[in-house]
Amino acid sequence: MQGFFWKTWLVLAVCGTPASLAHRPLSYGEALELAVSVYNGKAGEASLYRLLEAVPQPEWDPSSEGSQQLNFTLKETACQVEEERSLEECGFQEDGVVLECTGYYFFGETPPVVVLSCVPVGGVEEEEEEEEEEQKAEAENDEEVEKEKEDEEKDQPKRVKRFKKFFKKVKKSVKKRLKKIFKKPMVIGVTFPF
């Protein structure tokens, strides 16, 4: 008798639970608002960012169970994060940073997941050009410095020269890697309840 009670209770529990917990439909506008809110809350920036432009997504399906993508542009505002003001009250900074962002919503996950990837506009191409210019300038500067140091170092032992050369390479390598680390795109991933 006791086994029958537990089997019945288990069947009722399974029947009473929805087969899949469907998410609340999310319109394209709501998805953009949520993406901007997530960026402002998780990016760790001092200033708030506001939507500058959104690429229309005619294939956006608010009731989709799969993944959805949206593309948009954010711009830095004059408001600071700690002020906790509404974005509508915040005007854009004249020279504010502009970010190209791509958001991916994964509605098939429980809870749903959003992943944002943002990079400064013109960042990649300009960074490459800046790097090339810096390398040229460094090479020219290095040649001049080397000529001056050669005159001074004629009397120094070879060991000292080798160490200086080695540490110069290490210094350049560290600088280059630090620049790359700090210029990588920002990627944020969060789950959100419906």
UniProtKB/Swiss-Prot annotation:
It is found in: Secreted; Target cell membrane. Expressed by the venom gland. Keywords: Antibiotic, Antimicrobial, Cleavage on pair of basic residues, Disulfide bond, Membrane, Secreted, Signal, Target cell membrane, Target membrane. Residues 125-157 are annotated as: Disordered. One of its GO terms (biological process) is defense response to bacterium. Residues 23-160 form a propeptide. The keyword Oxidoreductase does not apply. Belongs to the cathelicidin family. This is Lachesicidin.
